[in-house]
C-alpha cells in the first residue's frame, strides 16, 4: 500500500508526513523538548561553583585517575562532574571557586575513557585555564 494520490489527497499526505517525521532521529531529538531538562538547558556554556575536587578512574584497558571537579551550576542548581584538562591544572582550582563549564565533545555523551563526564572546565574566576597553565595570566586574589 503506497501513499495516497489524487487531487483531494493533500491533507492526508500532510498528516502522514507529520507522523513519519517522528521516525527521524534528529527531528525527534530537536523537537521532543528534552533539551530544557539537561544541565545546560540549551546553552553552550554555564557558570558554576566548585564543590569538591575528585578523581575518576579511567575505563578499561586504561589505568589512570582523571582529575575532575564536582560543580553546582548557578542557573539551576544541578550538580555535574567536569573534567579539568592539562597536566596540573587541578592545582589552579580551589573549592568555592567560580568556574565556566563547556561541553566536552560527542554531543552530550561521555568522551574517551572517562565514564559519565560530559563537561570540561574552561575558565576559573574569570581567567582562562589555558592562560593559567601557560603562566600568561595569574588567578585574581579573592
Swiss-Prot record:
Assigned protein family: Belongs to the universal ribosomal protein uS12 family.
InterPro entries to which the protein is assigned, alphabetical: NA-bd_OB-fold, Ribosomal_uS12, Ribosomal_uS12_euk/arc
Q: What is this protein called?
A: Small ribosomal subunit protein uS12z
The answer to whether the entry has keyword Ribosomal protein is yes
Keyword Ribosomal protein assigned to the entry: answer is: yes
**Species the sequence originates in:** Arabidopsis thaliana (Mouse-ear cress)
Modified-residue entries (Hydroxyproline), positions: 61
Instruction: Give the molecular function GO annotations.
Output: mRNA binding; structural constituent of ribosome
Q: Name one GO cellular component term.
A: cytosol
Pfam families per UniProt: Ribosom_S12_S23
**Which CDD domains does the annotation name?**
Ribosomal_S23
An annotated GO BP: translation
Alphabetized, the UniProt keywords read: Hydroxylation, Ribonucleoprotein, Ribosomal protein
Q: Which PANTHER family is this protein grouped with?
A: 30S RIBOSOMAL PROTEIN S12 FAMILY MEMBER
Amino acid at each position: 500500500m503506497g501513499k495516497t494520490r489524487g487531487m483531494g489527497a493533500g491533507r492526508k499526505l500532510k498528516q502522514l508526513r507529520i507522523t513519519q517525521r517522528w521516525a527521524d532521529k534528529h527531528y525527534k531529538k530537536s523537537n521532543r523538548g528534552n533539551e530544557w531538562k539537561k544541565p545546560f538547558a540549551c546553552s553552550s556554556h554555564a557558570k558554576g561553583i566548585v564543590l569538591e575536587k575528585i578523581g575518576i578512574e579511567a575505563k578499561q584497558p586504561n589505568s589512570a585517575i582523571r582529575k575532575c571537579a564536582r560543580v553546582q551550576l548557578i542557573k539551576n542548581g544541578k550538580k555535574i562532574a567536569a573534567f579539568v584538562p592539562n597536566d596540573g591544572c587541578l592545582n589552579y582550582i580551589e573549592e568555592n571557586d567560580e568556574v565556566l563549564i563547556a561541553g566536552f565533545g560527542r554531543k552530550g555523551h561521555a568522551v574517551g575513557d572517562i565514564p559519565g563526564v560530559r563537561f570540561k572546565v574552561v575558565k576559573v574566576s574569570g581567567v582562562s585555564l589555558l592562560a593559567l597553565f601557560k603562566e600568561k595570566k595569574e588567578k585574581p586574589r579573592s
